[in-house]
């Protein structure tokens, strides 16, 4: 194929002007792009060119007359040189391209040029139905008179166009073979119409696609020609981008180096930072950076794989459309030489990542990994976390691994955890709660052979790198390298026999399969006589099921027992009843329990009794001939040992020789109780036990082990005093009682469990059995489903409480007394109090309720009105002020305070109305007396003035020196015609009763405030600013009131800020609104206390003292 294409290229190059066909051949897919309306991209990354480029470059043709011609319109914006192909009769042809000034369509060009075989041909390019057809007609009839086609010279397939085995064409994938059901070189027009490949159908598809293709190519019309024809420009751009990336990478590397240098310099400058600490910190930082890089690498690899997969699928679809002859839009063409997601290798080169490859991607199904594989993966990817400190486990940090659950922890954390355990039997693993006895001290590898394993880049962290050799569950050692987690199942081959031992089988050691032969077991059973009749089985045979009959020794009973080795040898047993066999004497029967062998001789026989009961006198021979004869006694003392007396010297019977038991001892025995409290002599007949086992009646008063009850046992000798009483306290479940003996501390949790499902209130959540007693209902996150008193949706979740929380949605409600309508009252609150006075009329009819807004009646039963009467007095007009009453007001002196003043109004004082009435009465009496005196002298007096009621006036005080001083100042100011607006304020300086009273109690503070305000006014008058301020320190209410009232005297504004107890006053003096008072508060106090200030002598105009 390559040789043939080279021949075609060379032939066309020799014939055409400018050797333009060679340039066409250099562009991959050039003819193909022209055929489908695409663009030629020299640098397109197309992996599917082996078959498609060859087929499309030669434009399959056939099935149409050789003289049929049509015009192929080139898409708008394409600047490729128009070309035409030569061929005929379904053959392949190539003709050099002919330059044309038109860039929008292909024109029919008739060009005579010698071909590869030095034949002048007139090629015609036609594409009326979407499939390129070429007809080549010879221009010299003498050379080719029959107008034959040149298929034998132009087709690469030889005589058979579809014989792929005979051609040199090689397809790189099965999907590259064209769909011949859609495309055929020898297809007739009728067959093409049937298969959907007719000219009309394909031309319709092209016409529908062409407008969209033209619209897509219009924005790229400018410069498309330059991009395809001048690939040197693209190469230069690529080099420029590479240089920019290199410069950016160098800048990033320099910036990272500077940052690392600064960080190292700061770390080295810290106090107490040793070289070992810096090395450890550097190792931690390096591992952290590598972990972050490892976490990002799988994501980049996954994105790159997805991109490659999508690109491969798009390229396959495009090549399939090319083979089937369907047009392709420009948007589907991939003209980019670079991938949107570069490969991880390329990113690693650009970013200068460490050449060390990261761990592989984790498997999609994590459950398929064993615990050992998961631990290895987590160690390699540095994902392990300590369960105690919840920190990452580094490769250089000492670790400890549990031999039960194989969890890895920091060795330091494990030692701290084990040392803090308060259990007496050991300590528990934080992961599996397995009880361990020994405390971890050493840092060992996973297999335990190497102490303090070194950190190696080539071996797994925390391992020794040697063979594990651990033995778990069998006699074979693990053959893997030192690894975390449990060892894998043993793979050693072993020979196992069946249960009966007749057959054997070779299998892996880890296999738990039982070897059974299926025959009868036939092993001896436990009885040693019968054999097992069951099928071959593993383990011991069952006990023998046969029954053995046994008979008692006396012959009265018999029984059946299982057949065992003991029952086989023993055919008799003892029934424990009285034997009842007649004795040899013939008079008595055997009273022993059922026994084997012969019965013992009679105890009363002459052969058995040879002496008297005390044993001192032998029985004469011939005195007793049978067991029925009486036993003779002697006259001696019995002297048999009794139970009384001290253990070392017991008492003896003092009666004469006798038959039967000895009578009670008449002596006394010294008895000491076992607790040591009692030591006395008691009669032997009163002893119920031995002398050394006597007990007193003293009760023990010590506390028992529970610490709650007393021992209260008589003659107690216990040391621990365990409490035998039941605890009987209610357990944490609230339903059951503690059934353990009374103990100290809390009772254990209730051990009972319920085997019924435990549902929440609404039934959405459930806890399946077994449910421990006392377990609370499951937490449900659904809204509460109970019936609520209001219509609002519930704002709380499902709960198990007896009552629902109150509804807190704001509603609009009136207060108790209908004074105020508020919109922020919770729905669950039925009403509220606004805090205002109730104002409802009381039963007395003259007053209203003054209580804060409340619910219910204003007065309780039996309560009377306590308010003062508000009716006016007929004399003075003030209120009655007596307790609420019915009828006329009582005549009582009026105690209402009335303000009185002097004639000039400077002095003011509060007096009771009663005193003022007496003063008025005295003045009226004096006036009447003077009028009568004038009339007695014969002067004329107006009778109406005498009989008229006396006018009451509040100016009853006398003016003092201060009043006269103010009057003098006022007249002086009026005489001088002073226009000062502050004259009135300065001349009439008045201090309130509060200021004067406070100044008497605390003159130091009053003087300090007065001087501060004086300095503030002086500063404001002299300042260029409009006002000056001063902030007083934190004060209580009385001190702040003093400052406020003194500020009024100076004409200064005062404002209080902050909240109690940090409230203070800020005084602001305005330049044009403040003044100095005429008299200071100290002078007023001195004048009121009787201390007159003597004026200091001053020089007159002549320089002499007055």
Swiss-Prot record:
Biased amino acid composition, Basic and acidic residues: 232-270, 278-323
Tissues expressing this chain: Ovaries and embryonic central nervous system.
Zinc finger NF-X1-type: from-to: 474-492, 527-546, 585-604, 644-667, 706-725, 733-752, 844-867, 876-896
Main location: nucleus
Biased segments, Low complexity type: 189-201
Cellular component GO terms, alphabetical: nucleus
Presence of the UniProt keyword Protein biosynthesis in the record: no
Domain R3H: 1006-1071
Keywords: DNA-binding, Metal-binding, Nucleus, Phosphoprotein, Repeat, RNA-binding, Transcription, Transcription regulation, Zinc, Zinc-finger
Coiled coil location: none
Pfam families membership: R3H, zf-NF-X1
Region (Disordered): 7-26, 189-371
Modified-residue entries (Phosphothreonine), positions: 335
Subcellular location: Nucleus
Residue ranges, compositional bias (Polar residues): 336-354
Biological processes, Gene Ontology terms: negative regulation of transcription by RNA polymerase II; protein autoubiquitination
Zinc finger regions, RING-type: 386-433
InterPro entries linked to this entry: NFX1_fam (IPR034078), R3H_dom (IPR001374), R3H_dom_sf (IPR036867), R3H_NF-X1 (IPR034076), Znf_NFX1 (IPR000967), Znf_RING (IPR001841)
Positions of post-translational Phosphoserine modification: 336, 339, 343, 354
Disulfide bonding pattern of the chain: none
Similarity-based family: Belongs to the NFX1 family.
Protein's job: Plays an essential role during the late stages of embryonic neurogenesis. May either fine-tune the guidance or the spatial maintenance of the migrating SNB and in nerve roots, which are composed of axons originating from distinct groups of motor neurons and may be required to either guide or maintain the position of these nerves along a direct and straight path to their ultimate targets in particular muscle fields. May play a role in egg chamber development and/or may confer essential maternal contributions to the early embryo.
Name assigned to this protein: Protein shuttle craft
Organism: Drosophila melanogaster
This protein's encoding gene: stc
